[in-house]
């Protein structure tokens, strides 16, 4: 709320200009309001120890879960928001009442799906492609995540294994296709593919960075990262394998490539396939970072099964939700919050994990 000092400052502006006319004085007051950083930014200063005020906590709750100012019910309880259980009750209420768009935004940001509508495929290789394909795929992804969080109260294992409805996808492109879990979403396949076909390295980096929160070093200076254009003399795996054999690249690619190659049974549009250019698809792979050696699993579904039970995947989901809801990166002081969110995501539900951030003490503090 506006404090006395702010009101007094605006009153001084008005009083100073009032002799020159009412309209000019009022215009100056409005200009001062519009130029204030508080008009553009949600500024949360807290007290000397970084603890937020009751109204700052109310703002954080409402913007984290509904992306809007606090409603009447939240303001009526503002003096009780120091109680974790009260914050949790309001977080769950806000998610249920107005949080569907917030959840869709979170998943799009986490999984890097923003702007997918502009993705296009090479018409020479995918003549069946149209602008409707990425649009419908994004709608399918939104509906999948919304159903998991709000309708099923699904957990981390469900995120990687639940059946994905394909009703809204263009039938001329996806006739007879079935999808299970986030790794089989066509939207994800397109977002990590080239217009001419799949990109195993992009897919492997995506899994490591976005789903496991691993840090990948950039390519060494002077390394050519371009891949030879596709032709029918070699499969995508063969072309990318040759590219990654450079000794300067092997330290990272030994972690990246096995993941990307396991996803090769899904084409650039996310459709299941068993061959490319008439040659069998080799979708053997692994996740060396998790101790799953290269060659020990085959295909997207097998990879999904491993990630579904990996503690690292649960922690990574928790880290991304903490970043999204608090608007900052996590630090070592957030370790117990991340563990609690990950535990709830695995043992109870994704929604419960989302609510858990509001119940944690870190939600009531400004980190410096």
Please name every model-derived segment.
Residues 1-29, 37:
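A conserved hydrophobic secondary-structure block that centers on an alpha-helix together
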Residues 3-7, 40-46, 73-76, 118-123, ...:
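Short, solvent-exposed loop/turn and secondary-structure capping segments
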Residues 11, 17, 176-300, 304-308, ...:
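Sequence context surrounding c-type heme c attachment/ligation sites in exported
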């Amino acid at each position: 709320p506006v404090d006395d000092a702010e009101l007094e400052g605006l009153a001084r502006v008005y009083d100073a200009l009032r002799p020159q006319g009412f309209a000019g004085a009022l215009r100056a007051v409005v200009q001062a309001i519009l130029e204030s950083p508080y008009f553009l930014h949600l500024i949360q200063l807290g007290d000397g120890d970084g603890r937020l005020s009751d109204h700052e906590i109310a703002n954080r709750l409402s913007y984290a879960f509904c992306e809007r100012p606090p409603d009447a019910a939240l303001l009526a309880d503002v003096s009780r928001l120091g109680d974790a259980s009260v914050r949790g009750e309001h977080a769950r209420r806000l998610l249920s009442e107005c949080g569907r768009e917030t959840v869709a935004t979170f998943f799009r940001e986490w999984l890097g799906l923003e702007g997918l509508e502009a993705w296009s495929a090479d018409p020479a290789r995918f003549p069946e492609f149209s602008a409707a394909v990425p649009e419908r795929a994004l709608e399918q992804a939104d509906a999948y995540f919304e159903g998991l969080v709000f309708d099923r109260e699904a957990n981390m294992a469900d995120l990687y294994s639940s059946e994905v409805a394909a009703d809204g996808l263009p039938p001329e492109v996806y006739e007879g296709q079935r999808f299970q879990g986030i790794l089989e979403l066509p939207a994800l396949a397109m977002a990590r593919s080239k217009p001419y076909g799949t990109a195993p390295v992009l897919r492997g980096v995506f899994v490591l960075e976005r789903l496991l929160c691993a840090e990948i070093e950039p390519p060494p200076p002077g390394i050519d990262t371009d891949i030879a254009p596709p032709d029918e003399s070699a499969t995508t795996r063969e072309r990318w394998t040759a590219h990654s054999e450079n000794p300067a690249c092997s330290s990272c690619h030994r972690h990246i490539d096995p993941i990307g190659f396991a996803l090769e049974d899904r084409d650039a549009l996310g459709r299941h396939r068993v061959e490319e250019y008439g040659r069998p698809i080799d979708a053997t792979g692994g996740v060396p970072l998790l101790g799953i050696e290269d060659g020990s699993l085959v295909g997207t579904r097998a990879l999904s099964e491993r990630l579904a039970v990996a503690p690292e995947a649960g922690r990574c989901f928790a880290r991304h939700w903490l970043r999204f809801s608090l608007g900052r990166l996590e630090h070592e002081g957030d370790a117990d919050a991340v563990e609690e969110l990950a535990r709830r995501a695995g043992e109870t539900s994704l929604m419960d994990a989302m609510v858990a951030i509001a119940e944690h003490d870190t939600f009531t503090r400004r980190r410096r």
